[in-house]
Amino acid sequence: MNQRVIISTHLENELVSALSECEHDKLFVLTDTTTQEMCLPVLQKFYCMKEAKVITIPASDSHKDIESLMMVWKGLQEGGASRHSCMINLGGGMVTDLGGFAASTFKRGINFINIPTTLLAMVDASVGGKTGINFGGLKNEVGVFNDSKFVILDTEFLKTLDAENICSGYAEMLKHGLISTEAMWEELVSFDLANPDLKQLQRMVGDSVKVKERIVEQDPHEKSIRKALNLGHTFGHAFESWALKRKPILHGYAVAFGLIPELYLSVAKTGFPTEKMRQTVTFIKENYGTLNITCDDYDELIELMHHDKKNQNGIINFTMMGAIGDIRINQTASTEEIKEALDFFREG
């Protein structure tokens, strides 16, 4: 992995240091309409940011599209960006994904730094080099692998988040626990997410990022073990795309919902312990509620799964678990088994 991840203790000093290693003729900051208001003022106090040009795009994942991408390209072009410029992506996963893609493609690539401001972006989107946009009703359909030069994690930004966004990011942490150790999983399913202890959460963020870093370093382009990070995402991306046409849900909620049928399949096909599955499902249902799908939605959801980037030769590809930390990549399931898992999701 070519990016450096910094757990911030003094954001200004760390940003100055990062910028000194990213030589640039012009500096840009990408925000969305939410982080422009909530987070940008923190950076604008820093002397190193006094010349930075701000580009702002509409907030929410529904704007993670070609139109917003073109807005960023236009902002860079009109701001006089060259191949030697640098862009800071200040925001959640939508900003770091789209901003990373914009920076990777503008003039064949300029340097960029991610400063994630949501829990989801801290533990998932900003680390690992995946960039991209949604296209044709499908999640992250167009993009490239390209590392930011730095990721600066300042957990003070967690104080700007509402409960729903904390829950969204926490779903990826729960996934990291499942693919890591019993001790990490146990702490995660025991955590009081309704009344979070912020200091404990900040420590857990560091642990979660280390899980992803360790996996990405082994497999930067998702040829093998990095597929572990797709746990919950085959069903999850289908749920998210399905919801986009009705009532959109946050990515982390889709992943949490996706863990339920995928752990069900893990019990049925790879021997995951039923009790661990039940504990995880109970935690998810208590903290995330449910998604109101019916049997009539099954064919659409399965069709969406067939469009998943993880598939090979038209076969839906799953990551399953044999136990906590026992990862089984490149697993398959029949249409009948997928429908049984959806039945379990609905009826539990």
Model-based region annotation:
Residues 101-193:
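A glycine/threonine-rich phosphate-anchoring loop and its flanking beta-alpha core
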Residues 76-90, 97-114:
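Non-catalytic interfacial helical region
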Residues 1-86:
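ATP/NTP phosphate-donor binding region
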Residues 78-81, 147-150, 156-163, 171-183, ...:
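Generic secondary-structure signature for well-ordered alpha-helical cores
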Residues 173, 274-348:
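C-terminal charged capping/lid subdomain of soluble metabolic enzymes
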Residues 190-299:
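Active-site segments that bind and position negatively charged phosphate/pyrophosphate groups
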Residues 94-101, 122, 238:
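Short glycine/serine/threonine-rich phosphate/pyrophosphate-binding segments
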